[in-house]
Amino acid sequence: MRRIITILLLALTIGEAWACTAVIVSGKVTADGRPFIFKNRDASDGTNNSLLTLHGTKYQYVGVVNYSTSSSPTSIWYGHNEAGFAILNTLSYYFNSPTSKANTGAGALMKKALGQCATVDEFEALLQQTQAQTTPVTLSTNFAVMDSLGNVAFFETCNTSYTKFDANDETVAPNGYLVRTNYSFTSPYYDVTNHVGEQRYKAACKYMEDTFGDGKIDAQQVVHELPRYLYHGKREVNLWDDIPDDINDVTNTYFSNFIPRYTSASASMMQGVLEGENPINTVSWIAIGWPCGSFTVPIVITPSRVLPSVVKRATDTHKSEMCTNALQLKNNVFTIYHDGTQSTDSIDLSKLINLEETGILQKVMAADAQVGELGMTLINQLRAGAANETEVAAYYNWVDDYWREFFNQAISPITTITTDKEDDEAYYSIDGIRYPSRPTTPGIYVNNHHKVLIK
């Protein structure tokens, strides 16, 4: 059965080049008492993300960077350091003026903060110093910060001022958590910004309310589910409500302004520590690459700076293997038009989810649960002093092998068939080149997730 689902969102859509979704949560309302900050990162000009470990003026830290050939990129887009300080941001549109969304200084400031800040107070002091400079840094952003003392807050920030929102303050965050997307409530242009990202704001709020209600918030559940949440906050459409029969039940579906989107580049939940716990036990759970097509891996800081090979920036390509692979999986989900071009706002839903549970998201979720379970065992051992860098390296090696096995199975066609028939409504691909109809050149092509031998 071939179906087309059209979700009428175009009239509601505003171009969001840097459209991120963030949640901060007080340790008062989490299942284990540890605070955390979460970000689903979108970046139209930086979708190939990777991890680096660097050393700032005071502290070693791990952070996510865009593709770059520099050994020390100028910007970090989220991360945590050995003192237990963590930071992320979302772009806040039109904070300084009703026509400008410039935010060129946020990445550099986050890099500086990771290298020298241990607490939220120290970050606030750095922010004050930055805004007091003769030539202010261009900022139009919502920073989220957390420290080993249990402090966790948003800073809605423009060029010359900021407002702090403390998640531990019940008058500010009655439910113990706060959500931000791409606007700021304190912006003088709040009423004329069209509240960019409001769809995702409403979706994130609904997820938190529906999933946890008055109960304790599970950090691992949030990072496992929220970056893959298929609910549209404004249209109140859940793509799980009418899913295709199987992977060949082509269902072209408009896919824009969900939390996961074409430009989603990575996701992270940075979890803090309990009172008195060693700050080195702060952990970043990171899905590098399109989150619907990648694993969430716990990242800790070690003396030798060990990282999984598949998530760190490679010395030759300057990209991460998992991110590159996840982008390939993403390309198999988004609609290919008959002229061979790819849509950025339409997916074949059957390739993402279906009743036979062979969609890429369903495969990812199942594998991600295993990665998370083993990762949580390791983190608990580290917290108890029952594991060290050797165990961390062994787990990372397992992640490398498991990811490569998973990807090869996910990207490889299910069966091999020989055909002389032409399917003019499907695309064929080989070595990354896509054809809108049956090619004439012999070879083994991917067609509808099957391997097709054309003679």
State the predicted function of each range.
Residues 14-19:
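Sec/Tat signal peptide C-region and signal peptidase I cleavage site
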Residues 21-73, 89-111, 147-410:
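C-terminal, well-structured catalytic/ligand-binding subdomain of enzymes
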Residues 80, 146, 428-429:
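Hydrophobic alpha-helical segments, especially N-terminal targeting/anchoring helices
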Residues 4-13:
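Sec-dependent N-terminal signal peptides
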Residues 1-4, 455:
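Positively charged n-region of N-terminal signal peptides that target proteins for export
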Residues 444-455:
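C-terminal tail/sorting-segment detector
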Residues 411-433:
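Residue-level detector of functionally pivotal "anchor" positions at catalytic/ligand-binding pockets or at interdomain
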Residues 99, 103-142:
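Proteins synthesized as precursors that undergo proteolytic processing into mature forms
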